[in-house]
Amino acid sequence: MGRRDMLSGETVIGRDRLIRHRTWENFGFGCTYAWLMTMLFGGDVGRIAGFDQMVLSIGFLLAGIGAGAVFSYASKTNVRVAGPIRSVPPVFVGALGSLMTVLIFVPLEGLALFVVLPIACVLSGCCYMLLVLRGNEVWAHARAERAMLNVSMGSLFAMLLCILSIVMPPIVSAALSSVLLLLGSVILNMTHVGRQQVRRHGEPSSMERRLLFKILAFVASFSFALGSLSALASLDASPGFHIALIAGPLAMSACIVAMTARFSPPTAFRRIHQLGNPVISIGCFLTLAVTSVFGFGCSLMLGGIVACDLFMWFVNAEIVARTKRPAEEVLARSCMIEAMAALAGYATVAVLGPLLGADDGTSFVTALALICGILSVVVGSFVFTSHDARRLIESHQMAERSFVLADACAAISDACGLSPREQEVMTLLAEGRDSPYIQSTLVIAQNTAKTHMRNVYRKTGVSNKQELIAFTHEKLARMKDEAVRPSDV
């Protein structure tokens, strides 16, 4: 039985994993993402435990997130290590992360500040990363439209929660932040997984590997700016500044939700990629040129960074869907680069800024953070260029057309009793290929190719290639008309 995708109207048929999307499942990613944003930009640790503890906690949190990503990536091929970790229920991971988050808000002094705080931050960061990877590993097997809508709606929900926590009394806000990982893990544990065909191409070519390297450089560039901006935010513990800071990501997330719901995945890909770097550039310019709109400029910078971050998740979901690489490998690799670059950006501003800033440390830190933002725009613009993004989008479009045709051919093959080799020949014929092309592609003799072609025509009840093409498209149209919408309950 097929189904019609709620956004594209295309039919998805298959036997592997399918997310039967229910709206409240977006809140799983939203809760975990909200935890990260509140810990980096909420300022609650500073208002409760003091400025010094907040500065240290952010650095240790980023280190813990990076450690979780490194561990996940390193253990992807080690079954003895990865197996026990993957068998741990998400709720247990979320409960441990929430417990460690409570310790972060407890005012600490002396030796405890350098023993208890690092342990709590690193463990909570690792728990966050394990939950994010587990959740996005599940969602990466959904179609691009569904994965994009889930991540963007989760981001919007996260920003709303972050603003809510800022306006709350510090103790109440800390309590909310402490339970976010647990809530996210409970929702993740309840996410329903069905069956769907995982659409995959072969291993990436050398050109695709170069593109993957450029994507990782792009991830490192905006993540470095994210870390530097979080260090800048730690200088001001006032709720007003943090609300203004989160307003940009909130507006950006709402915009991306609208685009993913309104446009096809290739169009949404292109528009989201076009948003990130220009918005960061405008934010840097306003912050440097107009002192009175400093908070607004920082808000735009963070909004652009969030757009780049969401684009990174969409690209990862696309890579997982189109290659044979495991989801945990692709996602952990990007998260590892993201966390390490963010930690480097944070350390650059938080450590070098006061050391080199002399009498005017705050102004120097601000300038250094803006320089990091400008560098991210330069790297993002000249390493992962608009040409690379367009090539990725065009390959997505070609893959989607090929996948849809392959679905129809697979259904016809099952109905008409074609052999696997005959199905391959029929798919090439439905694409309009001739006999020499089929011989070269499948590495078969001329007589063998002609025999398979005759068998395909005979079993499907057509007399030539044009009739087969028409028959395939008619079958595809019927599949779409007969598709069943997924349940929303």
Where are these regions (language model features)?
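Linker/hinge segments immediately adjacent to helix-turn-helix/homeobox DNA-binding domains
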Residues: 4, 33-43, 66-67, 181, ...
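Membrane-interfacial loop-to-transmembrane alpha-helix junctions, especially the N-terminal start
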Residues: 19-27, 54, 80-92, 143-152, ...
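Central cavity-lining transmembrane alpha-helices of secondary-active solute carriers
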Residues: 54-78, 251-256
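C-terminal ends and interior cores of transmembrane alpha-helices
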Residues: 92-110, 277-292
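Hydrophobic core of transmembrane alpha-helices in multi-pass small-molecule transporters
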Residues: 112-131, 295-309
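Cytoplasmic helix-loop-helix junction between adjacent transmembrane helices
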Residues: 128-151
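Glycine-rich segments within core transmembrane alpha-helices of 12-TM secondary carriers
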Residues: 144-169, 333-348
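Helix-turn-helix DNA-binding segment
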Residues: 398-453, 458-459, 470-489
